[in-house]
Amino acid sequence: MILTRSVVLGFLGSASLALASPVAELAEGSRLTPRGSACSYSGTSGAAAAIAGKAGCSSITLNNVVVPAGTTLDLTGLASGTKVIFEGTTTFGYKQWAGPLISISGTNIQVSGASGHLIDGQGSRWWDGEGSNSKTNIKPKFFFAHSLKGSSTITGLNIKDSPVQVFSISGSSGLTISGVTIDNKNGDTNSLGHNTDGFDIGDSDSITITGATVYNQDDCLAINSGTNIVFSGGYCSGGHGLSIGSVGGRSNNVVETVHISSTQVVNSQNGVRVKAVSGATGTIKGVTFQDITLSGITSQGITIRQEYTNSGYTGSPTTGVPITGLTLNNVHGTVTSKGTDITIECGSSASCSGWTWTKVAVSGGKADVCKNAPSGTC
């Protein structure tokens, strides 16, 4: 087909008009995100824009983002190698709901906090002393680190005033968390903060947490299931200490090859704790606590029990979750006079076996309570 001069000029004129048409101004927080670009989001619409554009970003910077009430900052399914950077202060609208407030997943993901940043849960809006036990005041969990694979990292985050549990680590492997600070000290006021666990780990492999500082009102660390887990260089204050379990009653009931070391537990309810669910089945094997310093422990310096239930301990330990290969090396410190130095409640000598305890010295509390404890322990 031969185009006449008038047709060509008409076509070019139309194209020129189209190019000259004004482009609508981008709303606050939104960015055009061609695949592999560095994306930045801010303000009240930043969360929605980040969620919509995440697939096309090689890096995502969140600057003073305000996440709407009842909305998860959903950064799941990120492209491999994506970097996520928190800048300024990240806040969340108030609503009674289960959360989470933040969720991130992917392979080789790098999450970090810029200098001076803060992720502020403003938990006092929910705190009522009941934590996640309330049926009327539902509180959002904070940060789901689920299905983070490869060599993913979470580095240098500053988190304040979580409504309830902070980090839920599930279905992840090869994840390293370093230099995280969780400051829930405000929850101590009138004992309103509750169930504010620092790190809950389940169904995960090869998880490393180093240099964490945790002020809270529940477990600093709780490993409910998982293998090849390292926690070192931690500081835990005000909560329930370092916990294995409770183990049992879940789809995955195996905790194996865990090394917890060089950590201080201060002004907490418990120091070192291992909990097996009464009547359940599972495995706790190859757990080591090394170079743990305790001070101001109010209830149990070291407690290892096979009769845990949600309502407390039954006093009649069972044997379905054997605790084997447990090592305590240089675990030392003080318990208050109303607490107990060491409690061991095992269902039988066979269900608690292969333990190695060296340089264990806990004092200041009531006399040890020991049932079917391996020799050389208490």
Swiss-Prot record:
- What Gene3D superfamilies does this protein's entry cite? Single-stranded right-handed beta-helix, Pectin lyase-like (2.160.20.10)
Any single Pfam family the record assigns to this protein: Glyco_hydro_28
Q: What is its EC number?
A: 3.2.1.15
Report which superkingdom the organism of origin falls in.
Answer: Eukaryota
Catalytic activity reads: (1,4-alpha-D-galacturonosyl)n+m + H2O = (1,4-alpha-D-galacturonosyl)n + (1,4-alpha-D-galacturonosyl)m
Q: Name one GO biological process term.
A: cell wall organization
* Catalytic site: 218, 240
- Check the record and name the SUPFAM superfamilies matching this protein: Pectin lyase-like
Where does the UniProt annotation place the signal sequence? 1-20
SS bond list: 39-57, 220-236, 346-352, 370-378
Please list the GO terms describing molecular function: polygalacturonase activity
PROSITE patterns linked:
POLYGALACTURONASE
- Report the top EC class in one word: hydrolase
Q: What does the UniProt entry say about where the protein is found?
A: Secreted
Q: Which InterPro entries match?
A: Glyco_hydro_28 (IPR000743), Glycosyl_hydrlase_28 (IPR050434), PbH1 (IPR006626), Pectin_lyas_fold (IPR012334), Pectin_lyase_fold/virulence (IPR011050)
Gene Ontology CC terms, in alphabetical order: extracellular region
PbH1 repeats: from-to residues? 172-203, 204-225, 226-246, 255-276, 284-306
The UniProt keyword set, sorted, is: Cell wall biogenesis/degradation, Disulfide bond, Glycosidase, Hydrolase, Repeat, Secreted, Signal
Main subcellular location of this protein, as a coarse class = secreted
Which family does the record assign?
A: Belongs to the glycosyl hydrolase 28 family.
The UniProt entry, under PANTHER family, shows: POLYGALACTURONASE
Indicate what this protein is called per its UniProt record.
Answer: Polygalacturonase
